[in-house]
């Protein structure tokens, strides 16, 4: 079992933690999130970005992690970036808690997400269905109020 954790911080009030667990390279990864400070009753883009570099805030994290050169999509789409985790839904207080299983996100192997950055976006991810070029790259999810580097956990 490999475990990883990400502490999300930013220049806004958005923050939280994301944990990752994977039994073996062929097993799906369980991603559990606990986020606070978002807009109430909203859907916010949730992605893994390529670089673990936050020197200039969340913009230094680069584009979505996409080792297979695909277009942006929903987590259930065949054509998607590895880093496309869709949206998190917030409650009336702007908090989001949940867990997802993802077979493309890996902690083990050549395309591990350890050392990369999780970003919570200020807008809703259109899941690549926005009908424009930016939709196929970013899902038009907007600015990056919070992010954090994924690190190995005990």
From Swiss-Prot:
Enzyme class: oxidoreductase
A Pfam family the protein falls into: Sod_Cu
InterPro entries: SOD-like_Cu/Zn_dom_sf (IPR036423), SOD_Cu/Zn_/chaperone (IPR024134), SOD_Cu/Zn_BS (IPR018152), SOD_Cu_Zn_dom (IPR001424)
Annotated substrate binding sites: 144
Co-factor remark: Binds 1 copper ion per subunit.
Catalytic function, reaction form: 2 superoxide + 2 H(+) = H2O2 + O2
Binding residues annotated for Cu cation, in chain numbering: 47, 49, 64, 121
Cellular localization per UniProt: Cytoplasm
Keywords: Antioxidant, Copper, Cytoplasm, Disulfide bond, Metal-binding, Oxidoreductase, Zinc
Gene Ontology CC annotations of this record: cytoplasm
Molecular function via GO: copper ion binding; superoxide dismutase activity
Keyword Calcium: no
SUPFAM superfamilies for this protein: Cu,Zn superoxide dismutase-like
Biased composition (Basic and acidic residues): 125-136
EC number(s) recorded for this UniProt protein: 1.15.1.1
Disulfide-bond pairs as recorded: 58-147
Function: Destroys radicals which are normally produced within the cells and which are toxic to biological systems.
Quaternary structure and interacting proteins, as annotated: Homodimer.
Similarity section: Belongs to the Cu-Zn superoxide dismutase family.
Listed name of the protein: Superoxide dismutase [Cu-Zn]
Species of the source: Cordyceps tenuipes (Entomopathogenic fungus)
